[in-house]
């Protein structure tokens, strides 16, 4: 394979707690629909188990949680990194014991959920975090648990939000999840019509999904070579490295020993692979 250099998709904005808190303090929340997105509302109406454990990451003003409570759901958790927002939510839901409001980083969150709702969280993350997103979602879902919601099927001139495509999502989530649905949403709000994919991804509990920190790769050709070598391991089903070559997920039928992975890349002394726990 060619070892030529290639562009790396980066995000120049520091999309940290300060950035997002400033958006809420300035009321600069252009992504806020002011209501539940219709495709998500339609799906919620099909969930019979009102005691199902439901997580909403990057929850924002969490109209989804409000609707869930109205429909009688009793085990809802929402998490966001912005203190100003979270304090407001705690005041709004102060007298409701059916919702837990968490201030924190989604990737540090622990728990098990039957459903996780995706609503403008994936697109708010720098693209370099997409592999980590897949790993964490798989980790947080119960066996047969489902990730459902909306992903953009378009690009944006100014980000965030960060766009994506059907082909990218299929490559990213394959084998870690079973695709019950991934198609153009039929009832998006007018301003997002024909740009949103509705997804229902069921956790594939039969497969192992592991995330690794990787050091030493500097070009797409090198990345392709390493990925190909990992694909040759018996039982490996999918390999996906992020756009700055720093993280990689490996989906496999059984756990792959870290020493095996390190030995495979030992042909270049710069390469180091470390499992994320």
Task: State what each model feature region is.
Residues 2-111, 125-206, 218:
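Class I (Rossmann-like) S-adenosyl-L-methionine-dependent methyltransferase catalytic domain
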Residues 7-10, 206-277:
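Flexible metal-binding regulatory segments at protein termini and peripheral loops
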Residues 117:
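A conserved beta-strand element that flanks and buttresses the S-adenosyl-L-methionine
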